[in-house]
């Protein structure tokens, strides 16, 4: 029984890990022919923004409508300003 529980747990963890490595443009409201490198870069901005603001909703708001919202633009601005402050 313990082996079965361990196997189920391992499969579940691997499913989540594999799922995080692939980005689905439709999940972000982007066209299917979007540049995946650009999508990955913008996704990283949103992840950093979520970490910076410590808000659970930051990532969702940031990626809405294929990263075209004011929230995404503000995230970019906030991260740039935070980078400038650490340089000083």
From Swiss-Prot:
Pfam families: Crust_neurohorm. It is found in: Secreted. InterPro entries: Crust_neurohorm, Crust_neurohorm_sf. Gene3D superfamilies: Crustacean CHH/MIH/GIH neurohormone (1.10.2010.10). SUPFAM superfamilies: Crustacean CHH/MIH/GIH neurohormone. Its main location: secreted. GO terms for cellular component: extracellular region. Disulfide bonds join 30-66, 46-62, 49-75. The keyword Secreted applies. Expressed by the venom gland. Residues 1-19 form the signal peptide. Keywords: Disulfide bond, Secreted, Signal. May increase the toxicity of alpha-latrotoxin and/or other venom components. Is non-toxic to mice and to the cockroach Periplaneta americana. Co-purifies with latroinsectotoxin. Belongs to the arthropod CHH/MIH/GIH/VIH hormone family. This is Alpha-latrotoxin associated low molecular weight protein 2.
């Amino acid at each position: 029984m313990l082996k079965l529980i361990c196997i189920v747990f391992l499969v579940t963890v691997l499913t989540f890990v594999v799922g995080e490595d692939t980005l689905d443009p439709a999940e972000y409201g982007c066209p299917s022919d979007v540049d995946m490198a650009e999508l990955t870069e913008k996704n990283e901005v949103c992840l950093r923004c979520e970490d910076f603001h410590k808000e659970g909703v930051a990532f969702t708001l940031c990626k809405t409508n294929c990263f075209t919202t004011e929230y995404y633009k503000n995230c970019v601005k906030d991260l740039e300003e935070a980078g400038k402050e650490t340089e000083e």
